[in-house]
A protein has these predicted regions:
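Generic preference for hydrophobic
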Residues: 75, 88, 110-111, 217-219
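Catalytic core of membrane glycerolipid acyltransferases/transacylases, capturing the structured
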Residues: 35-60, 66-68, 80-139
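N-terminal membrane-anchoring alpha-helices
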Residues: 1-74
Length: 262
């Protein structure tokens, strides 16, 4: 399905896509280094200072994507986000949503792999921003520790973003939802906001190419607390997958001109 979608849309010269992508990637990683240096004083400030600086970095990335790669973004359903603490279960197709969703929620934090917290500087800032680490190698203990930390952040009024499939999935790939989100939902007692998107069409998994087009993100109806785990997980998967399939089918990236074409 993913490759079929690549066949649709306005054609853009292959060499132009490659050139834009290389330029963007160079600037993207350069800005990471710049912001890591700029962020050093935030170690002496409250946690929200690094979160706000991360939002500035996210806006910079969106500007670079729009200016260089001709990738725009549209958010729908923002009025559906309830006030106060909640969990956010987002479709994960690309690295894009790991920074872009920072701009959707007022006090966001992410559930992340514990190994990321060990990366020099980058990981330290994740600790400072009070991200919620999870150890994939120790499942039961990991769920307990994750829940404890999640509750701490929810008491601070934060929105906890989790990717329920645990890893990036190519557009059109069969869903693979994990039980961790159901555990978090049952143990925290806060609403869960599903998020659908089509970012993988433009910023592909394990691809350096950035295809022009419009990434669409849709905030879906919140799932209230109180459902049993199985019912919740079935509803979550249905809501996210249905909306994501619609967004993917409605918008495909421009295709590069085949090599050798005139």
């Amino acid at each position: 399905m993913y490759h079929e979608l690549r066949k649709r849309g306005t054609r853009v010269p292959h060499v132009l896509i490659i050139a834009r992508s290389i330029l963007f990637n160079v600037l993207f990683y350069f800005t990471i280094l710049i912001y890591l240096v700029v962020a050093l004083p935030t170690f002496l400030m409250p946690y929200w200072a690094i979160v706000e600086l991360a939002k500035v970095w996210a806006r910079t990335n969106l500007w670079l994507l729009r200016t260089i790669c001709r990738i725009d973004v549209e958010f729908a359903g923002l009025n559906k986000i309830p006030p106060g603490p909640l969990t956010v279960a987002a479709k994960h197709q690309s690295f894009w949503e790991t920074f872009a969703l920072l701009l959707v929620f007022s006090r966001p934090t992410y559930i992340v792999k514990r190994e990321l917290m060990w990366i020099p500087l980058f990981g330290w800032f994740m600790w400072k921003g009070r991200m919620v680490p999870v150890d994939r190698g120790a499942r039961r203990q990991a769920l307990t520790a994750m829940t404890r930390r999640a509750r701490e952040e929810l008491r601070r009024g934060r929105q906890i973003i989790i990717f329920p499939e645990g890893t990036r999935r190519q557009p059109g790939a069969p869903p693979a939802y994990k039980s961790g989100i159901a555990h978090l939902y049952a143990e925290t007692g806060v609403p869960c906001v599903p998020v659908a998107l089509n970012s993988g069409l433009y910023w592909g998994r394990r691809s350096f190419k950035r295809y022009p087009g419009t990434i669409r993100v849709e905030i879906l109806d919140p799932i209230p607390p109180g459902l049993d785990k199985n019912t919740f997980l079935q509803r979550l998967e249905h809501d996210i997958e249905t909306a994501t399939a619609r967004l993917v089918a409605a918008a495909a990236p421009p295709q590069a001109e085949p090599q050798g074409s005139g």
